[in-house]
Design a protein with these regions (language model features):
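N-terminal intrinsically disordered, cationic/polar leader segments
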Residues: 1-87, 91-139
Length: 139
């Protein structure tokens, strides 16, 4: 991972074989980012989508492996139990122009991933909502 800071914005480039969520969490801990949002694009070789079922309060997942373009990656950064928390969604497309989308569980970079991350001043917290089973923003 390489990055550059311009005012309150970080321009991040993830490298081949790096995991998106893992690297973003490491980055936020290192830079002490407790609130923010990001968007990006690039290419992945593996991706795990997650979908939350409100009735069962459980996630199901779907994994893809191959060559996929990230056509949209966006999410936010908050803190839960004193640790960085990433909530991200992703859309990927294949060579036949099919696309898949959902909550991002994890993704492995195949070529590059270019992310613009905007740091907010202050802390945004999350807490578990017993009614839905989700970790919601505590605002």
């Amino acid at each position: 991972m390489r990055y550059k800071k311009i005012e309150s914005t970080y321009v991040i480039r993830l490298e081949r074989s790096e995991n998106v969520i893992e690297k973003l969490l490491e980055f936020c801990e290192k830079e002490k980012i407790k609130g923010g949002y990001f968007n990006g694009l690039g290419a992945v070789s593996e991706v795990e989508f997650r979908h939350f079922n409100l009735a069962t309060k459980e996630y199901s997942s779907k994994k893809l492996a191959g060559q996929y373009e990230i056509t949209s990656l966006h999410g936010n950064i908050s803190e839960m139990s004193g640790k960085s928390y990433i909530h991200a969604h992703i859309v990927v497309g294949d060579s036949q122009f099919n696309s898949w989308s959902g909550h991002l569980g994890e993704a492995t970079i195949s070529a590059t991933c270019e992310i613009f991350l905007f740091k907010l001043d202050g802390v945004i917290n999350r807490k578990k909502d017993e009614r839905t089973g989700l970790n919601l923003l505590d605002i």
